[in-house]
């Protein structure tokens, strides 16, 4: 199996290889987006290679085991797969695992990189039989590129234009059978025609603290970092249900253990290290607290619109919606309503404030 990453220039993004809304200066210790290319390289080293090594996402894992096994048994291309959910939950990892389990090559790119039909055509025509094409941020495909993709997904054919002007003509090219794995944090932004062409759709959920503790212990073993069960759980419970964050916090706690301790990670040492990093026991950092405080203090608990929150705390609306909000909502500290965001009773208690309407009690 081989893996290819197609850049078509500067990683498809602005300087530094990051999309504008995820530039390194916008990221936090507990952001689910990768901080740097160096971190991406470290993630690859810690990434599980097969489904049996993959922790969590039991429903998606079971489905993929069955569908991959059936495709392998029939020597066919796996049906096209859509993976969606918040960032950092393992969509890219699963794409690599799918290719490895099928024993085929993986070609990797992202939606913003595919600016022109010829970019996609170059990828598709170089795929071998049953290969996997992984498109991250597939919701950001341009309409003209998406149109080219439809016949490729349905009939393994593409139409390309030869020549220019009056002499231009369209020719049909046959493709090898292949599997498209699309990943997105915003499934609602996919067009219906594209969404309907995926035969396998898997939603990735936030991980439990117990699942993340298993991931932390596995990663610590690969990093040769001694850690006990309580130390692993302390890191896991502050990781916002996200493996990428758990691995990042583990690496920083390991640094702390090497300099301020004897190299071993215990619960007490992890607590000191994470307090230094401003990650509280709930897994919140200063941005989470700023958001909750803004909703409670500046907007009387809500409801308040996303744009108003963004302006209030100096953060982009997309970052709030994709990175900060999901965990706060999942943990019951924030509510989305038709009229806007509202702070819950848990948010007031977390900030040490009296809950409105609790005066009588």
Swiss-Prot record:
InterPro entries: AAA+_ATPase, AAA_lid_4, DNA_helicase_Holl-junc_RuvB, P-loop_NTPase, RuvB-like_N, RuvB_C, WH-like_DNA-bd_sf, WH_DNA-bd_sf. Residues 281-361 are annotated as: Head domain (RuvB-H). GO terms for cellular component: cytoplasm; Holliday junction resolvase complex. It is an enzyme of class 3 (hydrolase). Its main location: cytoplasm. Residues 1-25 are annotated as: Disordered. One of its GO terms (molecular function) is ATP hydrolysis activity. One of its GO terms (biological process) is DNA repair. Residues 208-278 are annotated as: Small ATPAse domain (RuvB-S). Mg(2+) binds at residue 92. Residues 5-207 are annotated as: Large ATPase domain (RuvB-L). DNA binds at residues 336, 341. Homohexamer. Forms an RuvA(8)-RuvB(12)-Holliday junction (HJ) complex. HJ DNA is sandwiched between 2 RuvA tetramers; dsDNA enters through RuvA and exits via RuvB. An RuvB hexamer assembles on each DNA strand where it exits the tetramer. Each RuvB hexamer is contacted by two RuvA subunits (via domain III) on 2 adjacent RuvB subunits; this complex drives branch migration. In the full resolvosome a probable DNA-RuvA(4)-RuvB(12)-RuvC(2) complex forms which resolves the HJ. Has 3 domains, the large (RuvB-L) and small ATPase (RuvB-S) domains and the C-terminal head (RuvB-H) domain. The head domain binds DNA, while the ATPase domains jointly bind ATP, ADP or are empty depending on the state of the subunit in the translocation cycle. During a single DNA translocation step the structure of each domain remains the same, but their relative positions change. This is Holliday junction branch migration complex subunit RuvB. It comes from Delftia acidovorans (strain DSM 14801 / SPH-1). The lineage of its organism: Bacteria, Pseudomonadati, Pseudomonadota, Betaproteobacteria, Burkholderiales.
